Every structure is written in C-alpha cells, then in structure tokens.
Swiss-Prot record:
InterPro entries: Ribosomal_uL6-like (IPR000702), Ribosomal_uL6-like_a/b-dom_sf (IPR036789), Ribosomal_uL6_a/b-dom (IPR020040), Ribosomal_uL6_bac-type (IPR019906), Ribosomal_uL6_CS (IPR002358). Part of the 50S ribosomal subunit. It comes from Pelotomaculum thermopropionicum (strain DSM 13744 / JCM 10971 / SI). HAMAP family: Ribosomal_uL6_B. It comes from the Bacteria. Pfam families: Ribosomal_L6 (PF00347). GO terms for biological process: cytoplasmic translation. This is Large ribosomal subunit protein uL6. Belongs to the universal ribosomal protein uL6 family. SUPFAM superfamilies: Ribosomal protein L6. This protein binds to the 23S rRNA, and is important in its secondary structure. It is located near the subunit interface in the base of the L7/L12 stalk, and near the tRNA binding site of the peptidyltransferase center. GO terms for molecular function: rRNA binding; structural constituent of ribosome.
Amino acid sequence: MSRIGRQPITVPAGVEVEIDGSTVKVKGPKGQLVKEMHRDMIIKYEDGRLIVERPANDKLHKSLHGLTRTLLNNMVVGVTAGFQKNLELVGVGYRASKQGNKLVLAVGYSHPVEIEPEAGLEIEVPAPTKISIKGVDKEKVGALAAAIRAVRQPEPYKGKGIKYEGEKIRRKVGKAGGKGKK
C-alpha cells in the first residue's frame, strides 16, 4: 500500500465533508472547496476521518492513492488554517503596492505591472519589498505566487528580482572583463 495513501485524514470539528461520486466538497471556517477526484479512487468518510482506498494494485492506482489523499488533506487544511506564500523583492527601486484589489509592481520595466488575484485569494503588502498571498486553495495560492515571481525572476549575477521568502538564489561570478593577457 501507499505509505501516504493509507493514512486516514482526521477531519477537525467545524468542517463538513460531502462526497458525491468522485466529487468532494469540504466546508470549513475559512471557506469552501470543491474538487473532482479520479473516478477510480474510493473515498469514504466515517467517524470523522477521510479514508482513501484504491481498487487495484497496478502502477496507476498506486500513484493516484497517495495523490488523492494529499489533495484531500490540502482541502481540509485549507478550509481550517488556510495557506500563505510570501515573496520578496530584491533590487534598487523594486517595490510593490496595492491599488484596491490589484497588486502593482515596479520592477524595472518602463511601466508598472498590475496583477489581479482570482476570487478567493488575498494579497497583502506588509512592506514595499514584501508580498503575502493567502487563500484556502493551495494550488491557486502557489500558482499566483509563481505568476508574480515570473514577472521578474531572480537573476544569478546580482540576485535582483522577485523571489520566494527563504529561497536561495544560485549566484554566478561575472566575467573577469579585461584582466587577462594583452
């Protein structure tokens, strides 16, 4: 059996789970998530625990077993605690601000870059060089963080750009311009 897939998910008090065929609906204090799981996976909700079982032991079902369990766990964690991703802006004059619901980035282009979050996502700018993304859907939070990072990825020479908090940028040594033989 899958080591991750066989672990049951404990559903905390205040979280409602509805299973309709392969569609799972999780409702909690932070919001609601609905996700379509693979039709072959068997999902049961009994005694305040979610259990995922697979119909066969072939390679496809073994890989789907752990995936389905992790997706369900992310849904439960999302509606109870939520997910957060933090970004940092590194570079002279690089800054972020909020205009209404939009995130406005000044990252060295001739124009400011505006990014509007999807419904259910919240962007905060605690400092001009810090961005915080919060939401109940881990996939959407990560996708928005990746889209913001892609606006100006960190470059390897000076490390300027938008990076995840705690991300280590592999640095390169620049050219040794004009220090060779003549």
